[in-house]
Design a protein with these regions (language model features):
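The first (N-terminal) embedded transmembrane alpha-helix
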Residues: 8, 14-32
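C-terminal ends of transmembrane helices
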Residues: 61-74, 123-130
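Mid-bilayer segments of alpha-helical transmembrane spans in multi-pass integral membrane proteins
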Residues: 86-95, 104-128, 148
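Hydrophobic, membrane-inserted alpha-helices
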Residues: 5-11, 88-91, 146-156
Length: 192
């Protein structure tokens, strides 16, 4: 990957980690191990080891089911508050190429901030709104949707990073609009 595409890939993978910590890491590990789409430099090439792939697979299964069980999903989100930004930092640094080679701390911080921001939006705005409006019934479908989005974004971030950038801009714009609309409605209700 060249510098431009590796930057988009890094941002895409770290954003994806904000939704599910293990999907982007497992995607990177599997694609690095079995294809030429991504080449990991040391120390990130450890992700290609079988024991790491196996561990990520087990953690993904645990996260998948924990996020679908009421009450357990809240505990999972608390734990993931630390795990997802860390996974985002690793995904960013592993895929950022030149940036990670010259400024590893900078790439780790960027990944941490991107994944942390996505996770914060998910756990502080989206999930509470879904829980409040559906009485918790919508949490499982939203969780499945988050896993699907994380998987698609992880693959797009590596295969077609420019397309990911366009999708990320659209999703970010929609999310800002949604927050603004929600705040406006809340303000209008408070005036009544």
């Amino acid at each position: 990957m060249n510098l431009f595409t590796s930057i988009f890939s890094a941002f895409g993978l770290s954003a994806s980690a904000g939704l599910n910590a293990y999907i982007p890491l497992l995607t990177v590990a599997l694609l690095a191990r079995f294809t030429d789409l991504i080449e990991l430099s040391s120390p990130w090439d450890t992700l290609e080891d079988w024991w790491v792939i196996g561990t990520l697979s087990v953690l993904l299964l645990i996260e998948f089911f924990a996020d679908k069980i009421p009450a357990v999903n809240h505990i999972n989100d608390i734990i993931q508050t630390f795990v997802r930004p860390t996974a985002g930092a690793i995904a960013f640094a592993a895929s950022a190429g030149v940036i990670a080679d010259s400024q590893p701390a900078f790439s780790l911080i960027l990944g941490l901030l991107v994944a942390g921001g996505v996770h914060a939006a998910k756990s502080l705005a989206i999930r509470p709104a879904v829980t409040a409006t559906t009485g918790g019934v919508g949490n499982v479908p939203i969780s499945i949707l988050e896993d699907i989005i994380s998987t698609v974004l992880s693959i797009l971030a590596i295969v077609i990073p420019i397309l990911f950038a366009a999708i990320a801009i659209v999703i970010t714009a929609w999310f800002v609009w949604w927050l603004w609309r929600r705040a406006s409605r809340t303000e209008a209700r408070q005036r009544m």
